[in-house]
Amino acid sequence: MSSAQQQFERIAREVIEDSFRMDPVGATWMGEHAFDSLLPDLTKYGQEQFSQRIEGYLAALDAVDDVELALPDLVDLEILRAFLTSTYFDVTQVAAHTWNPMLWNPGTAIHLLLSRDFAPLEERMANVADRCENIPDFLEQARNTLEEMPAIHCETAIAQLAGTRALLESLDIQPQIIQSLDQHVEWLKEQLPFAHKSPRMGSE
């Protein structure tokens, strides 16, 4: 194995692990269960740190001597570069974590663990409990991160959170977790009169 191939494979492993850690719900959906106890870090600080790491990954890929790579590895390198470039755009330009309240709905994080029989129920329920315990802090982070929102996104998030509440009520969890969800829904309702952001991308 050439040094270039070793370098590329190391970068690829770091990118995959970092991406799964930043999106543990997506990781659960894709069948990677190392982060099943976590909720995403969608805070401004977390996303800024992630964007800086992406810049580092892209610089590291540029430093790989691709002349030494076999064709399959060269193709994989360009796929990884495209993924990082797209993710960087999403984080820094789209920045949906600052205006799309639907991203802050913890319901999918819980539902995936309950609906997929990938591990014994006891193990999955332990991760459900961990994710549920993080919900109050997660929703507080949402309120500290979300800025002006499109009305349609705000209204849809409120409707979807009703389903999340029903899901949480079916579980034996602490009442304050459901109360934190109710508090967040009330906050979203308070934001509706000011939710004038256009859902379209770009300035025109």
Name each model-derived stretch.
Residues M1-E204:
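N-terminal maturation segment of proteins
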